[in-house]
């Protein structure tokens, strides 16, 4: 969905976030040198209007989590300095094009849904998080046994390595490698995909990815106490005695700078997984 922020006559506050690779540092240095003397821009990592991520999708995920509490005020734009990145609109040799587009920018944005996760521990504490791609729950040392509940109704009893819940844009990441479907981000939904489920005459699950609409809620209720590995995008945590994990579509969205260089979702999918097709 395309919307617009009001930037009329406003100096744009820009944060530049780069990984440690040589080419990323070169790109960041060029951007710093241009923006520091430009009266239309103000370089600041505090309360930015625009966050420029330099690196790859992992760097964009890190930038998202740096500013996940300011999503209503921030727009992101990615520059890729390696192989093609799914979230990036610019390559490292297109810095001048990015600068020109930002100078012409009128606040237009492309918005994608994100995931909200609430993890309840046995002492009553609730750990909350947001994910741009996916959240996974695994129990490494033993088979994970958990009830999957949709809208307060038990759907199935799961036995296997774990469960992944992804956003539409995250459907092209780990979810796809698990055999899940690719979901267009204008469809505000979550996708639940099993990780190595046990299916036989005794234990059965649906065995297919499930698409959950925005108004619905997924709950995962582990049946055994112990240590669970929970991943939120590119961050992994070891949590003891998890009693419930809840998943929702967040009311907030991530916003990307919309410009002539913004790549459509299906072109991103084609470039990432198919490439050029011989006629």
UniProtKB/Swiss-Prot annotation:
Signal sequence bounds: none
- What InterPro entries does the entry give? ATP-NAD_kinase_N, ATP-NAD_kinase_PpnK-typ_C, NAD/diacylglycerol_kinase_sf, NADK
An annotated GO cellular component of this protein is: cytoplasm
Catalytic positions are 57 (proton acceptor)
Cofactor entry? a divalent metal cation
Query: What are the protein's GO molecular function terms?
Result: ATP binding; metal ion binding; NAD binding; NAD+ kinase activity
The record's EC number reads: 2.7.1.23
Q: Which UniProt keywords apply?
A: ATP-binding, Cytoplasm, Kinase, NAD, NADP, Nucleotide-binding, Transferase
Q: Which reaction does it catalyse?
A: NAD(+) + ATP = ADP + NADP(+) + H(+)
Which residues take part in binding NAD(+)? 57-58, 133-134, 159, 161, 172-177
Where does the protein principally reside? cytoplasm
Q: Where in the cell is it found?
A: Cytoplasm
Q: Name one GO biological process term.
A: NAD metabolic process
> Tell me, what does this protein do in biology?
Involved in the regulation of the intracellular balance of NAD and NADP, and is a key enzyme in the biosynthesis of NADP. Catalyzes specifically the phosphorylation on 2'-hydroxyl of the adenosine moiety of NAD to yield NADP.
UniProt lists the family membership as follows: Belongs to the NAD kinase family.
The name on file for this protein is NAD kinase
């Amino acid at each position: 969905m395309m919307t617009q922020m009001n930037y009329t006559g406003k100096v744009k506050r820009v944060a530049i976030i780069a990984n440690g690779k040589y080419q990323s540092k070169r790109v960041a240095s060029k951007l710093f040198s241009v923006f520091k003397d430009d009266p239309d821009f103000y370089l600041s990592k505090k309360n930015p209007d625009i966050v420029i991520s330099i690196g790859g999708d992992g760097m964009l995920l890190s930038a998202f989590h740096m500013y996940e509490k300011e999503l209503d005020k921030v727009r992101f734009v990615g520059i890729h300095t390696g192989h093609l990145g799914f979230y990036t609109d610019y390559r490292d040799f297109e810095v001048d094009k990015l600068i020109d587009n930002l100078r012409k920018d009128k606040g237009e944005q492309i918005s994608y849904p994100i995931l909200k996760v609430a993890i309840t521990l046995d002492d009553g504490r609730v750990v909350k998080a947001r994910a741009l791609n996916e959240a996974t729950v695994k129990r490494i040392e033993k088979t994970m046994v958990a009830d999957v509940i949709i809208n307060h109704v038990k759907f199935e009893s799961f036995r296997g390595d774990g469960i992944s819940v992804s956003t539409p844009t995250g459907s092209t990441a780990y979810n796809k490698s698990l055999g899940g479907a690719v979901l267009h981000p204008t469809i505000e939904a979550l996708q639940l995909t099993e990780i190595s489920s046990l299916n036989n005459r005794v234990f059965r699950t649906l065995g297919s990815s499930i698409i959950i609409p925005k108004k619905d809620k997924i709950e995962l209720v582990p049946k055994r106490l112990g240590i669970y590995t929970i991943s939120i995008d590119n961050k992994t945590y070891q949590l003891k005695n998890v009693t419930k994990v809840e998943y929702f579509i967040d009311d907030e969205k991530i916003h990307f700078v919309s410009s002539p260089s913004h790549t459509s979702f299906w072109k991103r999918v084609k470039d990432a997984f198919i490439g050029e097709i011989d006629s």
